Amino acid sequence: MSEELSDFILSIANPTWNRLVRKLFTQYNDLFLKYPAAKMNHHAFGGGLAFHSLSIAKLAKNLVLQYPQLNQDLLISGALLHDLGKVIELSGPIATQYTLAGNLIGHITLIDEQIVLAANELHFDLQSEEMIILRHVVLAHHGLLEFGSPVRPALMEAEVLHQLDELDAGIQMMTGALEKTNSGSFSDKVFGLDNRKFYKTEEDF
């Protein structure tokens, strides 16, 4: 996954976003590759954070082929950064718990703080449009205020990142539930998907 991550970072043509993403991953690369994406629910395993983020980056890259009006650099930057705050929010890949900062601040605010710090160290103008929209796609990726985002998506790329985040998380949760389910039976309730059960067909059609 490390090589794949490097390839995605290199693909970011916007020089501001490229330098900022490179700086943050220079600092957090090792943790990013080892951490889970969550304590429970989706991608809650060692390396799950990188697996989830890179899955979204791959989905975004393919989606731009269908919808060229989307800004690929913004989507890829957002995909790589959106959950990077998990390396501060969570204690680690083993016996994962929430840290004090994770409980009281949360990963969305934590990564936004890191983006601001990195931008200041790089002498970027935080009031420039390119910095504001990058922060926006990261801050808005949970989609709704009640789900933890301080703002709702107001850019097409922000809405797309939110939808891809939901899609990738949902598929991983369904896959995990169905792997433990006998053919011709329903899975246990999946908490992260409104406590719904999912059916595993008896045959592969």
Language model features: what each stretch is:
Residues 1-104, 128:
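Acidic/His-rich, divalent-metal-binding segments that scaffold phosphate/diphosphate chemistry
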Residues 2, 17-18, 131, 157, ...:
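Alpha-helix initiation and N-capping motif
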Residues 4-12, 23-24, 114, 137, ...:
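Residues that form generic nucleotide/phosphate-binding pockets
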Residues 11, 27-31, 117, 121, ...:
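A structural signal for alpha-helix termini and helix-coil/disorder junctions
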Residues 51, 65-181:
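Divalent metal-dependent catalytic cores for phosphoryl transfer on phosphate-bearing substrates
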